[in-house]
Amino acid sequence: MRKHVLAASFSMLSLLVIMGDTDSKTDSSFIMDSDPRRCMRHHYVDSISHPLYKCSSKMVLLARCEGHCSQASRSEPLVSFSTVLKQPFRSSCHCCRPQTSKLKALRLRCSGGMRLTATYRYILSCHCEECNS
């Protein structure tokens, strides 16, 4: 009986290895998603304070978009039949930018009992999009 249980366990293990983990991605997006340099959201902590008033500063969790986009940047000359060439090149590039964000606010306590509200955008997701000139 012990040999049958061991054989069954070994067979299930072999089947899992052959089939792979069904919860993980198996398409090419998994390879791209696993690149640690890809465009993604990164968290960091920063101190928020008012530049003019004497307020107590607050430590806040912020997010930024950072990383590489898979599309290559390119510039190529434009051909013109005019003597004045206003825009001599056509450029194409992609930048890592916020895709979705939400407005957040925090209150700072200042001298004299005054309270000031600071607002900022908290980035929820990032993506690659064409850069503006």
Swiss-Prot record:
Effect of I18K: In EVR2; the patient presented significant phenotypic heterogeneity between the two eyes
GO molecular-function terms, A-Z: cytokine activity; frizzled binding; protein homodimerization activity
SMART domains: CT
Signal peptide (from-to): 1-24
Main location: secreted
Domain of life: Eukaryota
TM segment ranges: none
Tissue distribution of the protein: Expressed in the outer nuclear, inner nuclear and ganglion cell layers of the retina, and in fetal and adult brain.
Keyword Signal: yes
Residue intervals of the CTCK domain: 39-132
InterPro entries assigned: Cys_knot_C, Cystine-knot_cytokine, Glyco_hormone_CN, Norrie_dis
Localization: Secreted
Keywords from the named record: Deafness, Disease variant, Disulfide bond, Secreted, Sensory transduction, Signal, Vision, Wnt signaling pathway
Gene Ontology cellular-component annotations: cell surface; collagen-containing extracellular matrix; extracellular space
Disulfide pairings: C39-C96, C55-C110, C65-C126, C69-C128
Reported impact of V60E: In ND; reduction of protein amount in the extracellular matrix
GO biological process, one term: ubiquitin-dependent endocytosis
Pfam families named in the record: Cys_knot (PF00007)
Function: Activates the canonical Wnt signaling pathway through FZD4 and LRP5 coreceptor. Plays a central role in retinal vascularization by acting as a ligand for FZD4 that signals via stabilizing beta-catenin (CTNNB1) and activating LEF/TCF-mediated transcriptional programs. Acts in concert with TSPAN12 to activate FZD4 independently of the Wnt-dependent activation of FZD4, suggesting the existence of a Wnt-independent signaling that also promote accumulation the beta-catenin (CTNNB1). May be involved in a pathway that regulates neural cell differentiation and proliferation.
Disease implicated: Norrie disease: Recessive disorder characterized by very early childhood blindness due to degenerative and proliferative changes of the neuroretina. Approximately 50% of patients show some form of progressive mental disorder, often with psychotic features, and about one-third of patients develop sensorineural deafness in the second decade. In addition, some patients have more complex phenotypes, including growth failure and seizure.
Assembly and oligomerization: Homodimer; disulfide-linked. Component of a complex, at least composed of TSPAN12, FZD4, LRP5/6 and norrin (NDP). Binds FZD4 with high affinity. Interacts with LRP6 (via Beta-propellers 1 and 2).
Name assigned to this protein: Norrin
High-level lineage: Eukaryota, Metazoa, Chordata, Craniata, Vertebrata
Gene expressing this chain: NDP
